[in-house]
Amino acid sequence: MDTIDTPGEQGSQSFGNSLGARFDLPRKEQDPSQALAVASYQNKTDSQVVEEHLDELISLADSCGISVLETRSWILKTPSASTYINVGKLEEIEEILKEFPSIGTLIIDEEITPSQQRNLEKRLGLVVLDRTELILEIFSSRALTAEANIQVQLAQARYLLPRLKRLWGHLSRQKSGGGSGGFVKGEGEKQIELDRRMVRERIHKLSAQLKAVIKQRAERRKVKSRRGIPTFALIGYTNSGKSTLLNLLTAADTYVEDKLFATLDPKTRKCVLPGGRHVLLTDTVGFIRKLPHTLVAAFKSTLEAAFHEDVLLHVVDASHPLALEHVQTTYDLFQELKIEKPRIITVLNKVDRLPQGSIPMKLRLLSPLPVLISAKTGEGIQNLLSLMTEIIQEKSLHVTLNFPYTEYGKFTELCDAGVVASSRYQEDFLVVEAYLPKELQKKFRPFISYVFPEDCGDDEGRGPVLESSFGD
């Protein structure tokens, strides 16, 4: 396996400073770490929403070490095919640049085409970054494991491939001292073709590495499934409080910081529910509006693995003005990955930031009905744990088992799986009450003496063992 590059200590904070070395700006006073951010919307009713979108774009830029000095938004029904931004707004941007001469970067809250990016840079004399490039850079700086690095580098390579001409255009201008900026005939075109071949080869190698990682994860999932421990995945919009909730439920020390994509690598921890039942909780990468398709494709296996857990805890920042949009972003991702929506518990987090009773009715009526919590203060956590317990019990067979003392190891196995509700010692047997998941029912069938009435339908207290009660 090839060596995987890992981000340096400075991470994406050095990205803004590195732009000066990568791009030749025409004016000395320009600083590529200072930017103008722009966003568009379809009609006047979206004007308030677009301001929230700009705030998110500013946070993305800040995570990359870029300071946004000025923002603009406007209605854009039909983008320009050549520059994305229409002529009138380009002239408005040029006036802004006169007012803020230090601005060296234009950030657009969309993914634009390579030709639009090149044409804008040539027209405005700025580095032009789209939303996708910012998100890719942040993911690159947050990736800590080999798997995450493979996924991010694969997404970056796919994004870079059609944009090599743009980078060579800047290099040729540097070599020619800024002149017309055209390619040196022959040399530049040959080098672009060589670079394209190298990038394609890198995509091929990274794809092969990712397939190997996916295979390893599938094997681990099989082992985990055979153990019969129920699994929950924490999903939701970035910065919604998933890692804080994981720490609270598992007494873990997962990295928590109030910034976008603080968690990129999935982390799994054991959680003990009321009554002693063990489950596994996995914290996953946060979603975001307009998540780049290259990233969705590269992280598809990671996202699918999360969505295929037994139950999803969909964590929503109830205090955010665009909470409903964040919910829809998650549901849209289900559709993009063509995944049927699994069992979900909607968790409205950060209710401590809201006045009592001020949670919008549209959030309260989300299906399934949400649990209100604060992962920071612990409010509502017992309600969440109780609901998790109920769901696990619904998916399990409530039974009594009789273990001869010669089979004590089987009892230990059930304890390790966290499915034992109680046990008592008798003269010839160890009598155990347990909730058996489907994965363990066939294995422990010989030891089951009773199935509880909620599972077998017998109204006479505890019922007899029924073959139809068991999984295949």
UniProtKB/Swiss-Prot annotation:
Residues involved in GTP binding: 236-243, 261-265, 283-286, 349-352, 374-376
Q: Which InterPro entries match?
A: G_HFLX_dom, GTP-bd, GTP-bd_M, GTPase_HflX, GTPase_HflX_N, GTPase_HflX_N_sf, P-loop_NTPase
Which Gene3D superfamilies does this entry report, sorted A to Z? 6.10.250.2860, GTPase HflX, N-terminal domain, P-loop containing nucleotide triphosphate hydrolases
Q: Where is this region: Disordered?
A: 1-21
The GO molecular function terms of this record are: GTP binding; GTPase activity; metal ion binding; ribosome binding
The family database entries (CDD domains) matched by this protein are listed as: HflX
Q: What keywords sit in the KW lines? A: Cytoplasm, GTP-binding, Magnesium, Metal-binding, Nucleotide-binding
Residues that coordinate or bind Mg(2+): S243, T263
This molecule's function is given as: GTPase that associates with the 50S ribosomal subunit and may have a role during protein synthesis or ribosome biogenesis. Specific for GTP.
Its quaternary organisation is: Monomer. Associates with the 50S ribosomal subunit.
Q: What is this protein called?
A: GTPase HflX
Species name: Chlamydia pneumoniae (Chlamydophila pneumoniae)
Q: What is the lineage of its organism?
A: Bacteria, Pseudomonadati, Chlamydiota, Chlamydiia, Chlamydiales
Q: Which gene encodes it?
A: hflX
